Structure formats: structure tokens, C-alpha cells
Regions:
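Electrostatic, structured charged patches in enzyme active sites and in nucleic-acid/phosphate-binding
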Residues: 1-226
Length: 226
């Protein structure tokens, strides 16, 4: 008989797309950048999404579970299928990011890919290594604590409130969240906290007291450099 965990895994896969890697932890997270839920198939995907995609101002959009074929040096095989991440930069440039079990630094180069329609073209390929993900784990853990505050803002637009908070940030330049709450005319402080969390994800501001385990009124921040 299937366990409750396996049933939940099956429902998640059915609702958000079947992934080939289903033996690791599955994560269902809300993406501010895409304004939609994401199905992430491992802890490594979670780390990379938080630290290098969601919070990266140079990344416009991304797609996990992107099946594509990469050209290899083996003449017998020619192209090898991989499950990767399609990344679109704010410049419009496309890259293929591939989380691997390799060690060492991230390797980036132009590779030849065969697309689903059979066309072949060169795209920048980045091999994301285990060693690199280890260096990003603490940062992603801090961002993970912001997700509940960001998720409460989902599917809603707060243009006037965001403008008020942003103007306040520009005036204060640095401080704690309590000071932002006290300096704005937004009545609901949870909306202010949610907007601040969203701005951290978007790279507008950065959290400066990195040793703190919680996110709240006493969290310190500063404006990011343009």
C-alpha cells in the first residue's frame, strides 16, 4: 500500500509536473519573480533557486525541469539528454544551468544543444557544482526564512504601498524594519514587512545582520548599490 508521503509526492508531481528526480526532497515554493508556485526536486535545486535565480537582479526568468540535449565528445552518442534549468537574463540572453555532482568551481562555456523542435544552436552552459552549492547554502537559508512573509503578498498588487515603502527606504538608506514601519503611512505593518521581504528577494535592499536567525522588526537592512 502506498504511504501517505508517496501519495503526497504523487499529487505534487501531478499538479506541478512530473520530474525525473523524485527520490530527493520535493519543495513547493512561491516565486516572487515568476508570481507562481515552483516544484523543486531536490535540496540543491532549492539552494540554487533562492541564492542565484530568485534573488539575482540580472535574472529575468527561469524554468526548472527543462529537458534538452547537449552535444558531447563521444562520437557514438553525439547528443546527451539532460534535465536542466533554462535561464533568461535581463538582457534577453538565454543560458542553460545544470546542477551536477561534480566538484570544483562553476564551469561556464558555449555548448551546442539540440532543442525539442530539432534545431541546433549554441547556448551558454553553466555546470553548477556541489562545492559551489555548499558556499551558497547559508545565504539560501536566510532567504528561505523570508518566504512566508513574501507568500502572504501573492497574487495581489500593492503599487501605492510599495512606492511608499521604497521612498522610505531611499530616505533612510539603512536601519531596521521597525524604523521603516514607524516611518511609513501604510496602516498594516505586515504589509510593510512583506514588501520589505519582497525587496530583499528582488535585490533592492540587503539584510545586513546576517548572523540573526529570524526575520522581523529587529532585522537590519541597507540599500543595494544600483
Amino acid at each position: 500500500m502506498p504511504s501517505l508521503k508517496s501519495k503526497m509526492r504523487g499529487r505534487l508531481a501531478a499538479a506541478h509536473g512530473q520530474r525525473t528526480n523524485t527520490t530527493n526532497n520535493l519543495w513547493l515554493c512561491y516565486s516572487v519573480k515568476l508570481n507562481q508556485d515552483l516544484s523543486l526536486a531536490s535540496n540543491n535545486e532549492l539552494i540554487y533557486w533562492l541564492a542565484d535565480l530568485e534573488s539575482n537582479r540580472n535574472v529575468k526568468s527561469f524554468r526548472f525541469g527543462y529537458n534538452i540535449q547537449i552535444q558531447v565528445n563521444d562520437p557514438k552518442e553525439n547528443f546527451k539528454p539532460i534535465e536542466a534549468i533554462q535561464v533568461i537574463l535581463d538582457t534577453g540572453h538565454e543560458e542553460i544551468h545544470h546542477i551536477t555532482s561534480k566538484t570544483g568551481n562553476v564551469d561556464a562555456f558555449s555548448a551546442t544543444f539540440c532543442l525539442k523542435d530539432g534545431s541546433v544552436r549554441n547556448i551558454t552552459y553553466r555546470a553548477i557544482t556541489e562545492d559551489y552549492l555548499v558556499t551558497r547554502a547559508k545565504y539560501s537559508a536566510r532567504l528561505l526564512r523570508l518566504l512566508p512573509f513574501v507568500a502572504q503578498m501573492r497574487y495581489k498588487k500593492w503599487p501605492s504601498e510599495e512606492e511608499i515603502v521604497l521612498n522610505t527606504l531611499k530616505i533612510l538608506k539603512t536601519g531596521d524594519i521597525q524604523e521603516i514601519i514607524a516611518s511609513t503611512s501604510v496602516g498594516d505593518e505586515m504589509i510593510v514587512v512583506g514588501i520589505v521581504a519582497k525587496f530583499i528577494f528582488q535585490g533592492v535592499i540587503k539584510q545586513t545582520n546576517l548572523s540573526m536567525s529570524d526575520f522581523g522588526r529587529s532585522t537590519w537592512w541597507s540599500l543595494s548599490e544600483s
